[in-house]
Amino acid sequence: MHLVDTHVHINFDVFAADLDQLQHRWRQAGVVQLVHSCVKPQEFDQIQSLADRFPELFFAVGLHPLDAEDWQDNTAGQILAYAKADDRVVAIGEMGLDFFKADNRDHQIEVFRAQLAIARELNKPVIIHCRDAAQTMRQVLTDFQAESGPVAGVMHCWGGTPEETQWFLDLGFYISFSGTVTFKKAEGIQASAQMVPPDRLLVETDCPFLAPVPQRGKRNEPAFVRHVAEAIAALRHVPLETLAQQTTTNARNLFKLPVPA
């Protein structure tokens, strides 16, 4: 059984002491490929070094909405240059909108649209962070696609209702679920995980955050994506192997990941 963890942050300091053991555990859990997200372009060299160390690691480059104030006149050029510099860059992101306690919504939208344009130019998918912003996100994506054409991508660590989920499915996006789908009170997320079409479903950890049950409260890590897959398989009443195969195929289709030899 093979799994792809489509969203990790193993460059964070919390992993520095045991990266080799981390790899051993994710391989034991069946994880054969990972997509490393990027919070800001300055992380690029560090993430690239991790991909040199771990051949199953692919990565993105972009600016997180919580860091939107760091956007400078040269940031778009940096992202473009980094994305062109390495074939292992499979996406632009993570980008998006985070309106939880935000007082810079208009600026976040500007930065988000700028990164959508980069992805469109490079024909790469986007990794989207959306928190407390689903309606605005829907409008921004709808407007951008009407103006510039379709952009592929994934709504990562998805926490929306089934109605909101359908909005982004209709826009052509994949939906990725994290450890939150295992939480007892996450009925809305669980309902969304049940209704996503099989060919648009992805799994992730978003490690080191949001460890799934039964590891909740611990540092999250890529091996725990198996718990996410098990929970979604149970919700959808399908064998784990079926869900693993489908989500792995989906990840490779979206991110154009090679099939390991």
Curated annotation (Swiss-Prot):
Tell me which residues bind a divalent metal cation 1: 7, 9, 94, 206
Q: Which GO terms describe its cellular component?
A: cytosol
Return the broad EC class: hydrolase
Query: Entry's PROSITE patterns?
Result: TATD_1, TATD_3
Loss of this gene results in the following:
Disruption of the gene increases sensitivity of the cell to D-tyrosine.
State its cofactor.
Answer: Zn(2+); Co(2+); Mn(2+); Ni(2+)
Q: How is the cofactor bound?
A: The enzyme activity depends on the nature of the second cofactor. Enzyme containing simultaneously Zn(2+) and either Co(2+), Ni(2+) or Mn(2+) exhibits high activity. Enzyme containing two Zn(2+) is poorly active.
Establish whether keyword Zinc is in the entry.
yes
Q: Does the keyword Manganese apply?
A: yes
CDD domains from the UniProt entry: TatD_DNAse (cd01310)
Q: What is the activity regulation entry?
A: Negatively regulated by excess Zn(2+).
Q: Where does a divalent metal cation 2 bind?
A: 94, 129, 156
In the record, biological process GO terms are: D-amino acid catabolic process
Q: Which GO terms describe its molecular function?
A: D-tyrosyl-tRNA(Tyr) deacylase activity; DNA nuclease activity; metal ion binding
* Keyword terms of this UniProt record: Cobalt, Hydrolase, Manganese, Metal-binding, Nickel, Zinc
Q: What is its EC number?
A: 3.1.1.96
Q: Which InterPro entries match?
A: Deacylase_DTD3, DNase_TatD-rel_CS, Metal_Hydrolase, TatD-like, TatD/YcfH-like
Write down the chemical reaction(s) this protein catalyses. a D-aminoacyl-tRNA + H2O = a tRNA + a D-alpha-amino acid + H(+); D-tyrosyl-tRNA(Tyr) + H2O = D-tyrosine + tRNA(Tyr)
State the family it belongs to.
Belongs to the metallo-dependent hydrolases superfamily. TatD-type hydrolase family. DTD3 subfamily.
Task of the protein: Catalyzes the hydrolysis of D-tyrosyl-tRNA(Tyr).
Its protein name is: D-aminoacyl-tRNA deacylase
The species this protein belongs to is: Synechocystis sp. (strain ATCC 27184 / PCC 6803 / Kazusa)
